[in-house]
């Protein structure tokens, strides 16, 4: 049985999330500049513009339709980031039972955050993202499903191509954390990498959805927002990272991250568990899905049902994998999922 985090800890997490997002915004736009609106393909986006010598610089901020971003634009002059207070909140939340990443994982995600990866609509996926659901959903997640020796980051190719901004090369960012990181040459292109490994075999992967031909599988996609570095195209990833949510990793003073919506993460795990060659990873997929299904059936039943129905309606192959993945769930989780989906009709 899952243990809920007490109400006091949930309140502290909400404060940490707010302060971390404010700190993120404050740190990104320290120059003496101003926010402007730009229109692209019938949508408006915030950009930050400042003078650098005799040049006018411009940085993408986010869509005007995002109420949280627009609110911070309006409050920008009054935002004050308190790192010490955030550290205190992190310590209190860890003491309350919420998970914290191992130090290396925390530093890697923090480095990507500071480099602007999440500002450029990148998404943290995999087990590190799963850790971040504890605070969002207000539950303890146990220990075994939280263990990892890798970090996975994803971004839509279309976003990367058209956002008009870029982080530094991933290898440079990672070597700022651990100088033993090296590129892992890709079999299809030895001059570009999607994976990086350090001296202790910790892996960092960059991924992008494959919504096209099967010919793209196993290849490298160059990502403009990753300074031209590569990402591995994967099926089903577009479903996972569609309309993500924000959370905080409990590292240092809190690291604000963008993660998949929990209901999509759960359904996606049922799909990918079927394709896994590595049995241990497949078991972990099902374990994480089962935990989230139990929580979401109470916290977000309509959203869980909608995520399932969206995946189910995608096509015959998706339905086959969903059925197979669901059958691998513990009996109680199978029943919970079935009742949640049927109850939403």
Where are these regions (language model features)?
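Compositionally biased terminal segments of proteins
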Residues: 1-44, 51-345
